């Protein structure tokens, strides 16, 4: 009896060959016990990443997929042209309630997204995010022709037109041979050909001529009008 008990104690104290061999070690033996401190120099295991969400509901009109049939049904309204959410303040309608909510801010004038660096505020979060780049010291889009740099690729493209203004003028005037580098320059130039002739109560321009009551969108156009028209009238009267 005594020999059998001693043998059982020895067997219990000796580790099994399976535990000694790292290749045959069971997976649970690598896990630390609740009250056992981690070995020095050991790297704690990272938490497992969640698997990507299942999106079994695919749109037949585009590559997008959705988790729920209701999301797919809402998305397909954009393809069908259905706009079931009308604006109560204007004739516009929208496919999604979120688009309608964003649009209604234009009527209320609300600007809930304020800039933390300046007094400006914006109606949409995306507008604020784009504005914050103007405060950032980094301007990752340098001009290859001069030391200037810009926050946006569109600003760099518009600036580069100034270096090649004589070469690139893709916006011609339909009334004369002139052409311009920017649509805004063409729009300002076309006011010379088609000045507003409505009365002061209906004119859209804020700069009005005191002699003939014509209105202009820009002050320089008003000055051009006064020099070209009223100076010639004064010369005719003196003659």
Swiss-Prot record:
Stretch list, region Disordered: 1-62
Physiological role: May be involved in transcriptional regulation.
Start-end of Basic and acidic residues biased regions: 22-31
Gene Ontology MF term list: DNA binding; zinc ion binding
Protein's UniProt name: Zinc finger protein 575
Organismal lineage: Eukaryota, Metazoa, Chordata, Craniata, Vertebrata
Gene that encodes the chain: Znf575
Family: Belongs to the krueppel C2H2-type zinc-finger protein family.
Database matches in InterPro entries: Znf_C2H2_sf, Znf_C2H2_type
Database matches in SMART domains: ZnF_C2H2 (SM00355)
The organism of origin for this protein: Mus musculus
Biased amino acid composition, Basic residues: 46-57
GO cellular component: nucleus
Pfam families assigned: zf-C2H2
Zinc finger extent (C2H2-type): 57-79, 85-107, 113-135, 141-163, 171-193, 207-230
Record keywords, A-Z: DNA-binding, Metal-binding, Nucleus, Repeat, Transcription, Transcription regulation, Zinc, Zinc-finger
Top-rank taxon: Eukaryota
Primary site of residence: nucleus
Location of the protein in the cell: Nucleus
Annotated TM spans: none
